[in-house]
């Protein structure tokens, strides 16, 4: 690669795309990499501010931006992803399915801190749909040392990105509360849960309404588990009131309690546990009336069979003091 004056470029091969930007009209390549410059091209090149050009001069120790973009792509791509053509040295990955995007943040940092290259992704642990852009990547200079690209490639041992499909399809909902059990009010909680599950193709296949009786709730949870449900959601009875017995009922199933309480508002009284591989979740009343709560941050992960840890829940405190009523899925979960 060498630098020459544009007026002297006739007959030379361009090393990179030449971009034209017209506000509100276009931002695209005026000439593509590999184009042989003609006399007629000179005025156009000057009109986009190109008084000098990089033209091709073979150097086996260097890698062109397009080839380097493919190396970066190879570090990111995984199953259920597709990519298009390279434009102006950049290439993008897209999702082929409705699923949960996972990002290896440490590996991503490794690449972006290596110098002269970048990968920009969506936030991890977010819901993606077919056709959604997942990431874009390129090197910063026009060419880069092959040795440098080989080195960074050797540091990334598994794909930076992954899309997990939503595989949990059968849910049990245990509705608690004496006011519902005794027919004093209508159950308005369960329909909310059904709608949220439907966003991920999950169906409520078991439903029970229980009094404020921990033994009854425990019995119904265990009954649901024997019917092979993938996830159990217990609504209500999660606060410190004397009649709220759901946390004790979940504990008495023998489930492993990950956390009772979350650093997110709405959703402080949220409970997450697992019995074997089956999540058993305690949902506070805010889930019924607030459009988005901590439940929405976690549900997409649970239905993708992505295990949520105590540390990950604790990490939600940063940004957790937010009104989720104005958010729509996909919702950001940083951990």
What are these regions (language model features)?
Residues 32, 38, 123, 127-130, ...:
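Residue-level recognition of short, solvent-exposed, well-ordered loop/turn junctions
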Residues 59-166:
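Extended, charged alpha/beta regions that create polyanion-binding interfaces
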Residues 241-310:
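Glycine-rich phosphate/nucleotide-binding loop
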